[in-house]
């Protein structure tokens, strides 16, 4: 475990102190501090159908092998070897969560892995914090993601290319090239504004 600075700029030496510093940093990073009120206008209120066995089976078959395990230490390969037995057990758990509308406490646990970025390696902010969650919880998450995707795609603007299936930043780069070429042809000035939000993913309100 590498040495990092604490809040006071000191270098903690003991592993326990370093662990505590990372805990403080991640808790602060994911603490909700949004001033805009939640806007629930237009929220879809009709109920989705129960979790179906074929959804669980579809997710397990599509999950990539040789991925890092979450806190429970269970590899995805085990579920795939057990096949229908794993499908039945996971389907029962997912259905219980769906009915109770309460996420499993075990599935809430994750292992944070700090991946260094450019800059001072002693600053926690110069690390990507990757969370390893259990493969069992990924099954439920992927089912929810697939169900939500059909609604999200209808709501997103056509000009958005990032974080959409089959599209990406390359589409926007192509658009920028096209705009520049047209501006040159007509000898007009153009201005681009690029905004990079710090910790954009970490600041999303997930409530």
Q: Could you tell me what each predicted segment is?
A:
Residues 1-126, 131, 135-139:
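Surface-exposed loop/turn segments and immediately adjacent short secondary-structure elements
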Residues 3, 63-74, 122-132, 170-207:
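Conserved catalytic palm subdomain of right-hand nucleotidyl-transferase polymerases, strongest
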Residues 34-58, 102, 107-111, 150-203:
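Active-site-proximal segment of RNA-dependent polymerases
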Residues 144:
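Extended, charged alpha/beta regions that create polyanion-binding interfaces
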């Amino acid at each position: 475990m590498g040495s990092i600075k604490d809040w006071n700029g000191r270098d903690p030496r003991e592993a326990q102190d370093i662990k505590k510093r990372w805990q403080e940093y991640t808790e602060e990073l994911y603490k909700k501090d949004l001033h805009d009120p939640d806007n629930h206008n237009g929220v879809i209120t009709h109920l989705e159908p129960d979790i179906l066995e074929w959804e669980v089976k579809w997710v397990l078959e599509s999950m990539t092998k040789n991925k890092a395990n979450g806190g429970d230490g269970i590899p995805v390969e085990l579920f795939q070897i057990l096949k229908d037995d794993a499908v039945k057990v996971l389907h029962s758990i997912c259905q219980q969560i769906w009915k109770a509308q309460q996420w499993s406490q075990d599935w809430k646990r994750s292992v944070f892995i700090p991946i260094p970025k450019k800059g001072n390696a002693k600053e926690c902010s110069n690390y990507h914090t990757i969370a390893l969650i259990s493969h069992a919880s990924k099954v439920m998450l992927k089912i929810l993601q697939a169900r939500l995707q059909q609604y999200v795609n209808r709501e997103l603007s056509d000009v958005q290319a990032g974080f959409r299936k089959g599209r990406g930043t390359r589409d926007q780069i192509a658009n920028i090239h096209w705009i520049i070429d047209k501006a040159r042809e007509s000898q007009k000035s153009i201005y681009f504004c690029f905004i990079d939000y710090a910790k954009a993913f970490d600041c999303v309100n997930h409530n």
